[in-house]
């Protein structure tokens, strides 16, 4: 009589997806123990699922995303944008202009994913091709990376809400102050930011 291996449990999938947000060692270990986790999707709520590579893409964890891609995880446009894969992103936008409205995990739009690439030309490309939603989250991402050039571009072009709070309840100005990034602090204040 053959015994069938049990599929990964919901808790294992959840743990793997959480690790995908940046814990490369845990991702490697868990995937070595059970390769079926690679494309397993955790359901956070009725309309919100996430895989480990989507987790990596939404937080800008390039090393985790690259590792998972080498294991044959699917490459979505949001992941390609986060990794700065301009040719791939441009190809997908040419193939179907509606890809500018693509979202990753938790419905996060393409623009905030692209900001993680820290590639101003790619950010401008996706924006000009229609990826205009998510400007406020994109600003939070750029501030958290301390990228003055991208913060300035977003403020000048994308119309983000400089007074919005991130998932930790912090405004972009608060984050810039905590990181002692005086150039970004001055820039945000010029655009009406408050703590």
Where are these regions (language model features)?
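Ankyrin repeat domain, specifically the short helix-to-loop turn at the C-terminus of the second helix
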Residues: 31-37, 66-73, 93-99, 124-132, ...
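Leucine-rich solenoid repeat scaffolds
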Residues: 53-60, 65, 69, 165-195
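A generic tandem-repeat structural signature
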Residues: 66-86
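Ankyrin-repeat and related helical/solenoid repeat scaffolds used for protein-protein interactions
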Residues: 136-179
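Ankyrin-repeat intra-repeat helix-capping/turn positions
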Residues: 22-23, 60, 84, 118, ...
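Alpha-helical protein-protein interaction modules
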Residues: 25-26, 36, 95-98, 104-108, ...
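Conserved ankyrin/ankyrin-like repeat signature
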Residues: 26, 63-64, 88, 121-122, ...
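Ankyrin-repeat boundary/"N-cap" motif
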Residues: 6-18, 39-55, 74-81, 102-113, ...
């Amino acid at each position: 009589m053959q015994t069938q291996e049990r599929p990964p449990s919901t808790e294992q999938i959840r743990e793997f997806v959480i690790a995908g947000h940046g814990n490369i060692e845990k991702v490697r270990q868990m995937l070595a123990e059970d390769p079926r986790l690679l494309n397993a999707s955790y359901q956070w709520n009725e309309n919100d699922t996430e895989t480990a590579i989507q987790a990596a893409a939404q937080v800008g964890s390039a090393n985790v995303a690259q590792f998972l891609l080498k294991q044959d995880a699917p490459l979505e446009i949001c992941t390609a944008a986060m990794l700065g894969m301009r040719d791939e992103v441009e190809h997908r936008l040419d193939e179907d202009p509606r890809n500018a409205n693509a979202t990753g995990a938790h419905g996060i739009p393409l623009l905030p994913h692209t900001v993680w690439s820290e590639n101003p030309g790619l950010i401008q490309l996706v924006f000009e091709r229609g990826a205009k939603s998510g400007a406020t989250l994109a600003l939070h991402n750029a501030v958290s990376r301390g990228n003055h050039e991208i913060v300035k571009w977003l403020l000048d072009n994308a119309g983000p809400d400089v007074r919005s709070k991130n998932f930790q309840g912090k405004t972009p100005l608060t984050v810039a102050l905590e990181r002692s990034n005086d150039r970004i602090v001055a820039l945000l204040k010029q655009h009406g930011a408050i703590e």
